[in-house]
C-alpha cells in the first residue's frame, strides 16, 4: 500500500538561459533618437538652405468680370464682389450719416438741459437711434439693388445704365411694398433716380481715370 502514499516526481527539464542574451534596457539619448531616423537637425538652423530657391504659395485669383458695358468703380470678379462691396459701403455710409443726423437732433433737444451727464445721454440716444436705422435701411437697399442689378446684367450679358435704373426702381418698390401703391411709386422713383445719378457719377469717374 505504500504506493498510495508515494508519488513519482517527474523531473521537469530546465533550460539554461545564456546571460549574454539578456539585454538590460538603457536610457536612449537625443543623439541616438536622431541618428536612427531620417530627421536632419541641421535643417532647423536659421541659415539652413539659403542657397536654394524659395518656395512660394501661388494663389491665382478668379478672373475679373468681362461683361461689356459700364465698368465698376473698383475691379470686380462678379456679382459676389458687387454685393459685398456695395452692401458694406452703403451700410457704413448710412451709419455715418445717421450718426450725424442723430448728433444734430440730440444737441437740439438737449440744449436747454444744464446737466452735462443728462445732455450727453440724450445726444448718445439720438446717435444710437438714427445711426443704425439709416445704416440698416441703406444696407438692405444696397443688398437688394446689387442682387437685382447683377441678375439683370447676367440675363442681358452686359452692364448699362438701364440695368441700374431698372434695379433701383424694383428695389424701391419692393422696399415699400407693404405701404401701398403710392408709397411704392414714390420709393421706386427715388431709388431709381439715385441709381441713375450713381451710374453717371461712376461713368465720369471712370473716364477721368482712363
UniProtKB/Swiss-Prot annotation:
Localisation per UniProt entry: Mitochondrion inner membrane
Classification via InterPro entries: Tim23, Tim23-like
Segments traversing the membrane: 87-103, 133-153, 183-201
Keywords from the UniProt entry: Membrane, Mitochondrion, Mitochondrion inner membrane, Protein transport, Translocation, Transmembrane, Transmembrane helix, Transport
Bias-annotated ranges (Basic and acidic residues): 7-19
GO aspect biological process, one term: protein import into mitochondrial matrix
GO cellular component: mitochondrion; TIM23 mitochondrial import inner membrane translocase complex
Region (Disordered): 1-24
GO molecular function, a single term: protein transmembrane transporter activity
Top-rank lineage group of the source organism: Eukaryota
Function noted in UniProt: Essential component of the TIM23 complex, a complex that mediates the translocation of transit peptide-containing proteins across the mitochondrial inner membrane.
The family this protein is said to belong to: Belongs to the Tim17/Tim22/Tim23 family.
Known partners and oligomeric status: Component of the TIM23 complex, at least composed of tim23, tim17, tim50 and tim21. The complex interacts with the tim44 component of the PAM complex.
Protein name: Mitochondrial import inner membrane translocase subunit tim23
Species of the source: Schizosaccharomyces pombe (strain 972 / ATCC 24843) (Fission yeast)
Gene giving rise to this polypeptide: tim23
Amino acid at each position: 500500500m505504500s504506493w498510495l502514499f508515494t508519488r513519482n516526481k517527474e523531473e521537469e527539464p530546465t533550460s539554461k538561459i545564456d546571460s549574454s542574451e539578456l539585454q538590460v534596457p538603457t536610457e536612449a539619448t537625443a543623439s541616438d533618437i536622431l541618428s536612427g531616423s531620417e530627421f536632419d537637425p541641421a535643417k532647423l538652423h536659421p541659415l539652413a538652405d539659403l542657397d536654394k530657391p524659395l518656395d512660394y504659395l501661388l494663389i491665382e485669383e478668379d478672373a475679373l468680370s468681362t461683361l461689356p458695358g459700364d465698368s465698376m468703380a473698383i475691379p470686380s470678379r462678379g456679382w459676389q464682389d458687387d454685393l459685398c462691396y456695395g452692401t458694406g459701403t452703403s451700410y457704413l455710409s448710412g451709419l455715418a450719416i445717421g450718426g450725424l443726423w442723430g448728433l444734430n437732433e440730440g444737441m437740439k433737444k438737449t440744449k436747454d438741459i444744464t446737466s452735462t451727464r443728462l445732455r450727453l445721454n440724450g445726444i448718445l440716444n439720438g446717435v444710437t437711434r438714427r445711426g443704425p436705422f439709416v445704416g440698416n435701411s441703406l444696407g438692405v437697399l444696397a443688398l437688394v439693388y446689387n442682387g437685382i442689378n447683377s441678375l439683370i446684367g447676367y440675363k442681358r450679358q452686359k452692364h448699362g445704365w438701364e440695368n441700374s435704373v431698372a434695379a433701383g426702381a424694383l428695389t424701391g418698390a419692393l422696399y415699400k411694398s407693404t405701404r401701398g401703391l403710392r408709397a411704392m411709386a414714390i420709393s421706386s422713383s427715388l431709388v431709381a433716380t439715385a441709381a441713375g445719378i450713381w451710374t453717371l457719377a461712376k461713368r465720369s469717374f471712370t473716364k477721368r481715370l482712363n
